[in-house]
């Protein structure tokens, strides 16, 4: 009887641990998605400000803050890619398993995005518009390549995400 009780308790503990791990993974995925959406919102606000020399209802101060937020969101979401969040087969994430299969490439692209975001913030603070354009293009290239390589896209999402995937956030990017 004691063996049955031990086996039952072991099974129950294992099940509860697995359930908690699954919930933790789902929470991490949700935080990651919110971070990425926050980055995209800021990119969409920044792009017209950088692209057009018009008096928009958006100031350089807001542009610097958006660049700073992009950098911060990238820093905060950097650790939100543990293997336990590889739940694309359960349709809980659009991140493909390739992230974890070729992790070095993912880390390289992520680092490029972080560097571009940091340099973009500096260029905006210094009114260095040539480098603002360059770093916005670098950010677009890093994010666009990462999305094209590691994000599953459903046909229904194509219209919404085409500009994010192209990596061409401003018109002068090659």
PLM feature spans:
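Sequence context surrounding c-type heme c attachment/ligation sites in exported
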Residues: 22, 26-55, 59-64, 68-174
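Sec-dependent N-terminal signal peptides
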Residues: 4-13
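N-terminal signal peptide c-region/cleavage motif recognized by signal peptidases
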Residues: 14-18
